[in-house]
């Protein structure tokens, strides 16, 4: 801004210039006798005014320069302040939570699970969150017990964004829980559960063609991954596992193809998988020396799947060939030289209004490697299944009733399992469960009761007996 004193000086100079322009007119009115003197005076005055005019121009240029500099300084200050404000606002999102390969995003998900439980018997697979079938013989495994179990707690990393080419994109998952045993057997080992790998696979997806190829360790096609029984206590080991519900995780490859990709109505899909062969011997079960690993004999499965808005159904077939002599023919005279593992499964789910009904039935033989026949291995034929009904009487409260049963051929079980006077052959099992659950946001809480009745026989000629067990649990779960 120009000061008042400067404006005054500029006004006086302008007035002087105006007067100077008027002086020549007055000079023509003077007499000739005074002409030369007057001309000299006028010339001096003009020179003086020209000097003042030059000073005025210099002052104007100085004021313009000062104004420009002030404007630039103000603009720079405003830009600095704006940049500082933007930096402060953007600071919380400066770095991603996870970093991976360029173009690949990583997401961490999972849940924390805790169950306080009481039992009147010891169960097989374990007590607490993996209790399934009462352990035998009855006398050695009776007695009440209680505890708190958190081993269902699970987390996984999902990787997305990778590209194979223009048509195929990629993704993957690594999944862990805490059913990997314990840190030793000392007094404090039970409070130190060990993580275990559940799944580790990569997906190649052709979205335009409705094709997915999955490679790695994943659930086989018999396991009802999208149709498991509802429970807050039995998650890693679902209700009825080995007692009407079968399936297991194996390394392998699955090809999944949409059959009516992009069409309206029910969605049809065909899945075909080949998985690592496995059995309970005769060689090492952790060094690829079982009857399922002998030669090249993968487990082969196919599943036809259909789903709509409130229902789904699928049918699965399973086949594997087992060399009972083992790798390198280490067993000279097995009960049978070879076994064909065959299974058929039909499963479904329906959600009419507040109700949910789901279940499955299966039949086959030699299914021990997928938790068939209560995890008994041999050429054992069996039939089993489970059913569950759930009712949401409010958006947050629900009640669930469950029943499962497995009935292997008793003669087959005795032949293959009860080979010594102290061997226990599990002949039939029935399991029932009832739960009340409350869910709100990321949290779920519930109370659950499980009852299991087992019929068994000790030794090839032993008496057939019944044993039952109960578990009551209070459960909480937080999803993230």
What are these regions (language model features)?
Residues 94-280, 296-297, 301, 305-312, ...:
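Outer membrane beta-barrel
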Residues 122-127, 183-193, 226-232, 280-294, ...:
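Outer-membrane beta-barrel translocator domains and adjoining extracellular loop/strand segments
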Residues 169-180, 272-276, 316-321, 371-372, ...:
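Transmembrane beta-strand segments that form the barrel wall of outer-membrane beta-barrel proteins
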Residues 2, 19, 25-125:
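N-terminal periplasmic/intermembrane-space "pro-region" immediately following the signal or transit peptide
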Residues 295, 302, 306-434, 438:
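Detector for outer-membrane/organellar transmembrane beta-barrel domains
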Residues 428-455:
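Extracellular low-complexity, Gly/Ser/Thr-rich intrinsically disordered linkers
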Residues 438-440, 466-480:
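Outer-membrane beta-barrel "beta-signal"
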Residues 2-14:
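Bacterial N-terminal signal peptides that target proteins for export
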């Amino acid at each position: 801004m120009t000061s008042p004193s400067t404006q005054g000086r500029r006004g006086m100079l302008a007035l002087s210039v105006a007067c100077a322009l008027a002086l020549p007119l007055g000079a023509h009115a003077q007499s000739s006798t005074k002409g030369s003197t007057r001309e000299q005076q006028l010339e001096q005055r003009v020179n003086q005014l020209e000097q003042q005019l030059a000073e005025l121009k210099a002052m104007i240029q100085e004021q313009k320069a000062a104004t420009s500099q002030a404007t630039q300084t103000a603009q720079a200050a405003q830009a600095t302040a704006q940049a500082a404000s933007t930096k402060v606002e953007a600071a919380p999102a400066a770095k991603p939570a996870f970093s991976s390969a360029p173009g690949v995003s990583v997401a961490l998900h999972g849940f924390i699970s805790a169950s306080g439980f009481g039992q009147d018997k010891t169960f097989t697979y374990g007590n607490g969150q993996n209790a399934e079938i009462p352990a035998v013989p009855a006398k050695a495994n009776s007695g009440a017990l209680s505890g708190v179990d958190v081993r269902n707690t699970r987390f996984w990393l999902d990787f997305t964004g990778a590209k194979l080419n223009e048509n195929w994109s990629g993704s993957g998952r690594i999944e862990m829980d805490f059913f990997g045993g314990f840190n030793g057997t000392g007094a404090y080992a039970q409070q130190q559960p060990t993580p275990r790998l559940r799944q580790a696979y990569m997906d190649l997806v052709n979205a335009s063609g409705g094709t997915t190829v999955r490679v790695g360790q994943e659930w086989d096609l018999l396991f009802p991954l999208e149709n498991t029984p509802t429970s807050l206590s039995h998650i890693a080991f679902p209700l009825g596992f080995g007692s009407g519900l079968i399936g297991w995780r194996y390394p392998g490859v699955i090809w999944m193809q949409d059959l009516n990709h992009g069409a309206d109505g029910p969605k049809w899909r065909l899945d075909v998988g080949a998985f690592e062969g496995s059995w309970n011997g005769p060689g090492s079960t952790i060094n690829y020396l079982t009857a399922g690993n002998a030669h090249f004999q993968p487990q082969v499965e196919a599943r036809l799947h259909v789903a709509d808005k409130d229902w789904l159904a699928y049918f699965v077939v399973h086949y594997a060939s087992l060399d009972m002599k083992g790798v390198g023919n280490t067993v000279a005279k097995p009960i049978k030289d070879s076994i064909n593992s065959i299974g058929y499964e039909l499963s479904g789910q329906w959600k009419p209004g507040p109700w949910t009904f789901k279940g499955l039935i299966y039949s086959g033989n030699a299914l021990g490697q997928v938790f068939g026949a209560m995890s008994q291995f041999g050429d054992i034929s069996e039939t089993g299944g489970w059913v569950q009904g759930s009712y949401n009487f409010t958006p947050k409260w629900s009640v669930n009733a469950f029943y499962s049963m497995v009935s292997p051929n008793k003669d087959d079980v005795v032949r293959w399992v009860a080979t010594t006077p102290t061997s226990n052959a599990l002949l039939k099992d029935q399991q029932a469960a009832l739960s009340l659950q409350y869910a709100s946001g990321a949290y779920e809480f519930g109370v659950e009761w499980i009852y299991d009745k087992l019929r068994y026989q000790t030794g090839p000629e032993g008496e057939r007996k019944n044993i039952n067990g109960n578990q009551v649990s209070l459960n909480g779960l937080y999803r993230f």
